[in-house]
C-alpha cells in the first residue's frame, strides 16, 4: 500500500470528522456497480482486501478509497453496427438515411449495447493524516486528486482542504538547490531533473541518471532555465521527484522503511497497519520540512 505518487492537501485539523462519522458518511456514498444505461458509477469502496470496512484506520491515519467503474463500448463497434443498419434500410426500403436518422439509430444502438458492455474499474486511495493535518492522495494527476477531494466534500457535507500554497514556489527552491549544487537539511540531490526555458516555443531539457552538479547541467540554470522537476533523496528513507506544482512522483521507499514495516507485520492486516503509519509519518514529516524551506504557508 506504499503510495508511488502523491498529491496532498493541508487540512484544518480542528474541523476533521470523527472516525465513526467519516465511516458512516462514506457508507451513504458507497460504490455500486453500473446499472442499465449508466456509462459509469463512482463511490467509496473498501480500501483493503482483508476488511469490508470503508475506512482502514491505523492509529492517526485513516485510509479510504474511491472506486470508479466505466462501461467500455468501443466507437468502432457502434460504427460497424450502424453501417449495417443503414445498409439494411437502403436495401429494404430503397432510400437514403439522413443525418438525423443516423444519429437516432446510433443512440438506439448505444442503448441496446450498454447493459451488456464490459466494464473497467479504477481506484484512488487517500489517507487522512489527522496528526499533521494532511490529506495524501495516491495520484499526482490533479484531475484524479481533485475528484476524490470533491467526493469526500460531498459525502461529508464539506471538508476544509486547500491546495498547497507556500511563500516560495517549489520551482524557485529547486532551481536554487540545483544552482548551488546541494540541498538543505535532510535533502540530497538525486540524478534526475527537468528544466524549462521561456519563449514562444518553450525549450525543455530532461536529465536522467546524471550527476546534477555537473557543469553541463548547472549551465542550463545559468542560461535562464528554471527547474520544474527535481529528483531528491530525503534522510536516506525516500527517493522521489518533486514537481513545480508540489506533487511527488516516482516515490521509492528505501530499505530502512520497508524492513521496519515487515518487522512489525505478521499477517496482511498488521503489515498494512505498520506500513500505513510508517509511510504517512515519513511523507508528512518530509513535507513539513520541505514547507519550511519554502518559507512556510501563505496566509
Please give the residue ranges for each predicted region:
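Intrinsically disordered, low-complexity, charge-rich terminal extensions
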Residues: 1-299
